[in-house]
Amino acid sequence: MIVQRLLNQLIAQDIRDFRVLAAIAKVPRQLFVDEAMAHKAWDNTALPIGNGQTISQPYMVARMTELLIQNDPAHVLEIGTGSGYQTAVLAHLVEHVYTVERIKSLQFQARRRLRQLDLHNVSAKHGNGWLGWPNKGPFDAILVTAAASEVPTALTDQLADGGRLVLPVGDSHQTLQLIERAGSQLTSRILEPVRFVPLIDGDVE
C-alpha cells in the first residue's frame, strides 16, 4: 500500500512518534497538490504548489511535527499555511491550530481543503507571518514552514511558558532550530541543515 510505503520510509528515517505517523496516514496528501502531481503525492519529496511555494517533504513535516508536540500543546500557531497539508496534520494532533498565510490564493485553497476534510479546529488568517497572531496568543507551540533570516521576535514573544518554537533559520545556509521558553528565558538548539523557501516579511499578496 502506497501510504504504508511512505510510513516505512519515515520510520527508517527515525520518525518514532506513533501519533505523528498516524496523523500522516490520515491526511490524503493528494488533495494538497496539483492534479498533475497527484501521482507523486505519497512520494517522500517536496512538490511545487504554485506562487513559488512548495508542499514540504513528508519527512520534514513529520520531523518538525514530532519536535513540536513533545510538550503536548493544545494551541498551536503555524506560520505559512501553504497548501494546508502541515495544517491538516497538526489538526489531527492538537486542540486548535491557528495558521497565517501571506498569499491570499493559497490561503483560500487551503481553507477549502480543510473544510473538505471536516477539520474544523483550525482558524486561518491572511497576513504577514513575521508578526504572528498576537491577539490569539500566547501559544503552546509555534511552527514556521518557511526560512526566516533570523528568529522573529514577535514569535518568541507569543510563545507560552514551556512552549516550543520550531523553525528553519538562514538565507543560503539554513538550519532547523528548536527554541524553548522557560519563564523569561529562551534556549535554542540547532538540529540539522534544511532547505526551505524564504519567510517574507512585508506586504501580503
UniProtKB/Swiss-Prot annotation:
The keyword Transferase applies. It holds the Pfam family PCMT. One of its GO terms (biological process) is protein repair. The active site is at residue 56. GO terms for cellular component: cytoplasm. Its EC number is 2.1.1.77. Catalyzes the methyl esterification of L-isoaspartyl residues in peptides and proteins that result from spontaneous decomposition of normal L-aspartyl and L-asparaginyl residues. It plays a role in the repair and/or degradation of damaged proteins. This is Protein-L-isoaspartate O-methyltransferase. It comes from Aeromonas salmonicida (strain A449). The lineage of its organism: Bacteria, Pseudomonadati, Pseudomonadota, Gammaproteobacteria, Aeromonadales.
